[in-house]
Amino acid sequence: MWLLGRDLVHMVRIQCSFSRNQAYVFLGHSNFEIFSYVINGYLEHKDSMSNVEMLKRGDVQFTSAGTGMRHSEFNGSSTDPVHFLQMWVHPSARDLKPNYQTRSFTEEDKLNQFCLIVAPNTGETQKSVSINQDVRVYASLLEKDKEMEFKCDTGRFYLVHVCDTGGKIQLNDVSLDGGDGAFIEHTDRLRFVGKNETAAEFLLFDLA
């Protein structure tokens, strides 16, 4: 497990791999927005709100802990590891009613484009997970020599995480391998170029 990034709207980003039979066992939390992005394998979720679900690659699972809840994550396979990212954000208001959401995104949804997977709870999209904070998260799969440009607000902050799936990208003038991350501020655009035969999977965080 690695703690990465910096404290932007009190966000913690955790990259996890569980081998078979590994788990987080019933952790108790309140006043956190917690979402998991499954990269490979199967992740089993259980919580004190009676939610039980098996998550696979492409799934995003979200829990707003609000006034308080308990949850656990297990490797859902007895033979293969699971690799996922879990992000924790303090909500814009305290002691909200706990809630649970899941969304699924295909490879085509992310291929050579920015797929919005997490957005503020303002009704701007029905497909993404709704979060109680001014945060947007995009997922992408960028093929070799393909280019994408993201227009930025110079007053916001941006975080890029490249998933460790074999791909590489060039972000502006910086090369990023799998597992690498970059923090960007005071910019009006980000330029991404795929640099490997394997499509690069990455997440882009747009933060207040």
Regions found by a protein language model. Name each.
Residues 1-208:
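Jelly-roll (double-stranded beta-helix
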